[in-house]
Amino acid sequence: VAWSVKVTEEYAAWFTALIKDDLASATQVAEAVAALREEGPALGRPLVDRIQGSRIHHLKELRPGSAARSEIRVLFAFDPTRSALLLLGGDKAGNWQRWYKENIPIAEQLYLDYTAQAEE
């Protein structure tokens, strides 16, 4: 059984830019997303880890391999229909803590906006 994977506009724009800028890393992200589609919520470390300090208790990060010196992360959560929603992606290399501090609130808002829209 394949799990459904949905994306936000923010994730789609980031991934499109990644394909142009760093095809090797984009390929590794695509492989990690394929694993998520295959395993769903059962996918764990090292590819998936729970985000600490989020208001959304089930916010997670996808941790694909990355090319060169990049440390690609994709923040995601499973929605009420158990589809994986890829919220946003980025490269945290060189600013590990700041990347989370800046992006977790954005991911939380994207998720809340998505679930509110889905309820309408």
Show where each model-derived region lies.
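Basic, Lys/Arg-enriched alpha-helical interface segments
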Residues: V1-E71, P80-A84, D91-E120
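Hydrophobic/aromatic beta-strand elements that line small-molecule binding cavities or substrate pockets
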Residues: V74-F76
